[in-house]
């Protein structure tokens, strides 16, 4: 174990490329993420999102279980807001603001901004976007496709 002590430790200021390579190596050793998940994690890292691999794995698992990405995002946003409230005093009126818009996360600390970026990426890639669907029109307001009952163009003389 003395050989691992050589070089910069986790507390020192290592270049971002070295830190990313170190995280990648640790992930491969732990086998936390599958190959596809690793590719998605690397894309998130390349986009500037600094997120713990274990947290990323939890997010991916939630999305695989068809949990709505918006629900995951709002939960994480409220958790991050709770951490900020505990660490720094804020105006109580700021806590009651609605948490529905994604761009609010851009000015926050690195961790929550990274989570917001990953979740925004996941929201865009989710094909089921149930929160963005328009409600169906009731069938009573639709016109019948044929001219009327029994007047189908496919009916002919027999």
From Swiss-Prot:
Annotated positions of the Phosphoserine modification: 34, 152
Pfam families, A to Z: MOZART2
Composition bias, Low complexity: 112-122
Location of the region described as Disordered in the Swiss-Prot/TrEMBL record: 84-158
Biased segments, Polar residues type: 128-140
Assigned keywords, A-Z: Cytoplasm, Cytoskeleton, Phosphoprotein
A GO cellular-component term linked to this record: centrosome
Main location class: cytoplasm
Cystine bridges: none
Family named by the database record: Belongs to the MOZART2 family.
Protein name per Swiss-Prot or TrEMBL: Mitotic-spindle organizing protein 2A
Organism of provenance: Homo sapiens
Lineage: Eukaryota, Metazoa, Chordata, Craniata, Vertebrata
Primary gene name: MZT2A
